[in-house]
From Swiss-Prot:
This is Thymidylate kinase. Phosphorylation of dTMP to form dTDP in both de novo and salvage pathways of dTTP synthesis. One of its GO terms (molecular function) is dTMP kinase activity. Belongs to the thymidylate kinase family. GO terms for biological process: dTDP biosynthetic process; dTTP biosynthetic process; dUDP biosynthetic process. ATP binds at residues 11-18. Its EC number is 2.7.4.9.
Amino acid sequence: MSKGFLVSLEGPEGAGKTSVLEALLPILEEKGVKVLTTREPGGVLIGEKIREVILDPSHTQMDAKTELLLYIASRRQHLVEKVLPALEAGKLVIMDRFIDSSVAYQGFGRGLDIEAIDWLNQFATDGLKPDLTLYFDIEVEEGLARIAANSDREVNRLDLEGLELHKKVRQGYLSLLEKEGNRIVKIDASLPLEQVVETTKAVLFDGMDLAK
């Protein structure tokens, strides 16, 4: 790659994108791809501290706009400190959540103004968008059942939300897919992990023009 390539992974709770990423990493490294994997919120020290505030199960009183602004603050610091330098170094950067999460969760889920969210995303990123977004789609009930069955997963504040919010979030993602289908590729996350990994690999390699 002559320049960096930015990929974001998106999806409702329990879609399994983190597991897919863990399986993809050694495959990419075997290809000799210089890759950085990171996550939102978090990725850097300041971002991780903000993540703790956002996801703390005891912070049930958090206002929706406060939540949004915390995500945006984490996003900016993460980009400046970690993502942009990696892209400038020509690396493949794979982010577990990025700008679309704010639209899906705070826009569709919380009912905040989507134009305002778009403006804040633009402000925080200086207009940076992923070269490719992989959207892992799964029925809300199935995703939440996966979370409930995973005893290793730490419960966070979003896990405690009602079913209705998670359904709105999924609708938000499907709306984004319809609007930005040239950037966002839908992957059926209800399939067995091995199949999801293979599909993801094919889509990613095609997007990056890598030999399969």
